[in-house]
Amino acid sequence: MTIVVFATEYDAANVIFSILCRSPSEHLIFPIIVKYKPSNNVSFCLQTQKCKNSKRIDTVFVCHAEKLNLSHYIQTASPIKAEDVANSLNDKETESLYVDMILSQTGKEREDVEFKYMAYFHKSLIIKYLTGKFLLPTSPFWFLSTYGQTEGMLLLTMFYYLFEEQKSTITTTKNYVQCFTENTGNMVFTYSSMSEFINITLKSKFRKLFADFSTYARQKNLRDKEEFKHLDTQINLFRKSSHLTNTFRVHYIYIAYNTALETTKFVNYCNLTSYDSNLPIGQQCQRNLHILGNSLHENLLCIMKQYFNADCYFKTYIDIKRLKNPNLNVTEYEYALVSKKKTIQALTSEQITRAIAKCNKNGEGLFSPVKPGLQGLLEISASDRYVQIQDKRIYRRQHLHKDYHRPFPVFRVQLLHKNIFCFGNSEDWYENMGFNRILQYLPDEYISDEALTRAIWLQDTHFLCDDVEKQFYTTRHEIFNERIPVTNYIGDLDLPLQDTATITEETFFSMCRLIRLTLINAWKKIFPSIDTDTHPIFFFKTQCDTTNDTLDYTEDPTEIKQFCVCRKKIGLRISIPLPNGTAIAGGEPLKQLSKILNHVMCLDQELSQILNSITFPGECFDIGIYHTGHCIRIGYMYKTDMDKGKMLHGRLTPIFIVPEGYRNSCKTFIQMQMDLNNLLHHGTKKAPIEELIYNITDKGCPKENLSFMDLKSRQLWNKVNIATETLITKYLNTHGFNNNATSADDSLLSFIRLIGWPIIKTQLITHYETRIAQQFSQVTFIKIDSKNLQIKKTQFGRVSDFSCLNRQHRGNRDNVLVYIQLKADGNRLILILWSTCFATKCQSNSKQVHCSIALEQLKN
């Protein structure tokens, strides 16, 4: 059946209704595009609002071909009178289009009545059906803005999109047209009438290309499907073989598609699959199959495979700078944990300031003064400056206490009404924490990590007070001092929880064991001398906050027993001692180390599965704690929150993950986890420091605040542009104009007059009506800045602005400002012509862009 897509200049629904009722008005039917097929009938169709199975048009009435004589109207490009359509209507075929809809809506049975009467008495139903199902454009503007403004683009896109029932969008079909032919014909002006419009569509030379273009477009579509199927396969192969977190997985997919479909590659692919006149129509789009997916391997996948494989990651990306020397002369804390001697001092901020001022005064002429306050105290603690008096060394820190021979820790302690700072080099840690009694009743045999953790009963307290000695063992925080070497890596690990997460004891301990396995393997690559079976990693978990707990504690044997009832996050503190004799200098290496550990936690398949099931893993290790003066809560200590009624809560309780080598002596491991010097950044060790790590770099993301995925994203989107002035000079030289300009201003004006303006003017003459184009016959340019110029028209020796380029306003005055903007895009310039009009209809002086022209790409 011959199919005609038509339009009207009046409300199409009412025009169609009048034809169905055989009472046609004087309105006209305009055949826009026709698909011929030998038949006794002609089907008149409109585009539907929804397209099921890519069927984008549907019939609204059917005519007898012989009565209508459609070929006469097509050959003469004439509209069809509604009366002629009504007289040639095929009642039987047309009735079948509407009768079921009418009967289903009214609930009546079929009556023996002519269709025209049935239609007449159901006008509202038919009008509602037509307006609800079809698009009803009444001017050429809609077709031009939808399908394209040039003859070839309009017709080829419309024919393929409407008639071929292919799964291609309008945008995709337009891309196919550009690949099929470089010449898409003349511009069709948007202000043409419907009669002028069908004169173009029914007489166009592009009608001869419908069959070839449809064949090419189907082949291009198949090639695109095959290409993207292969690309998807390549992306999924890596995604399934690696163990990315959910967040990283999303980032990876975006980066992969953007890498494969980067502008240059996509343009090359389009050129490769463009229509080749030297090949038969059936052999188009067959060259270099899978080019996009194959390019992804070289540009991204081989890099990702190295970065997301633990062995390759450490070999290729991790660079560690070490200094080995038996005479390094650097030292960590000197801190005794079993001592009856009281050297701990507790001072407020004001008292510290006075103490530092006194220290500066006593050392005047001997030591350089330090800044009063906490920073000064930290500097004194780390300072090894001394004076020799009668063969005896007097250190600066001994002005604070005579027994402070080596660096001492500084703690922040929360009291009821204030913070206080404590420092010293000895305390009776085990006795005051009650650890001696705990160790006394511990079982000797190892049963399981879970049983061992449950067996520890710490002495507890609930209330905040102003007693320094009590609070020293409940709310203590260590203050980081980057001047002192780090002997333990202390990690603050927060795992944000999913809303539906259920954390059983088995899940939690499995997660901790896998975290230990992942981190100890990473530790082995950084410190090859360690024994992974015996090297400890100490875990602490913030106690669950049950103040807002709405759980039902009624016994239910079928209910899953939760080990953790936290709702927002799981807070873990992880301490990994460095090997004896090794230390890290400063906070920067620790930040990089935290990023590395963040990354390696995503590389283990089992760990990733658990983390993805209950948490939102990603950048979980906090890197903000490694700055001088920042503090972190020590294991076994409580949180304080004045809003919770001065109560202590959220204690860091020990989770014992015993390594294989300590299963036969688990009490020794527990003693190690109770040793405060294993829980402090700068804890005291037995062996002197002979190896110092002063720099750790992840070459994949050397910047502290960027992950590997973030860096890849920035590299994709942050295109490096050449300076506009440089591009202007290059264009002048390329086009054979000697740039003798003495300044950048002269170069810019020369470029616009000689190169830029002729191109813009040609665009205006070709695509704009005469009223607009004539305004630009004589112009001059005024430089605004290095990238913007204003255009003024010159007439009879006078300079003036322009009348509106968008509309003909009442009283159309010359008060519109017109500009040219230059924008660098890689190795080329884009020229943008824009204006501002004061009229309300033109958005009251807002920027209106009229054309944007990309100049040719310059060679490097």
UniProtKB/Swiss-Prot annotation:
Its EC number(s): 2.7.7.-
Record-annotated site: Essential for primase activity: 492, 494
Phylogenetic lineage: Viruses, Duplodnaviria, Heunggongvirae, Peploviricota, Herviviricetes
Signal peptide bounds: none
Superkingdom classification of source: Viruses
ZnF bounds (CHC2-type): 804-842
Pfam families tied to this protein: Herpes_UL52
A GO biological-process term: DNA replication
Protein name: DNA primase
Entry keyword annotation includes Ribonucleoprotein: no
